[in-house]
Amino acid sequence: MKLWGGRFTKETDKLVNNFNASISFDQKFYKQDIQGSIAHAKMLGAAGIISEEESTKIQDGLTSILADIESGKLEITDEYEDIHTFMEATLIERIGDAGKKLHTGRSRNDQVALDMRLYTRDEVKNIDDEVKALMEVILRIIKENVHTYMPGFTHLQKAQPVTVAHHFGAYFEMFKDRKSVV
């Protein structure tokens, strides 16, 4: 599915197509692209822009695409310029003309911005989950080392003795503040 270049008479050089393609890196947004498209299809149906039947058909089609990608039945290939083109072509192939109505009232740039926001939100949550797991380990180390001593450091020099619990407690407190950053 070609998105641009309709008025040109010659075939676009493969180097240009490769330069413009983003499928190699934006395919990681497939879940977010589907999530945003399902929400958009719901809105189109609720607003009466498309019929409820078409909205449901689009949502079901997108849900089946997600299931097939995650099960390995459907592979995202580089024959498409980007993840949005892949999704649209696959949806139209599965549900017919109703799939063409998904982009009503939404530009690809809107889609890219939404996909990136959703992806970033999901990745921040994943990182936060990892930090929480790390904090549990640190807390265990603290509890196990209340009476274990080590040299404290100041200006990269050995200083007064501190407990391992106190040392690790400083890191625990730093990680506790992670919510203010996010």
Question: Where are each of the predicted segments found?
Answer:
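A helix-coil-helix interface module used to build multimeric assemblies
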Residues: 1-179
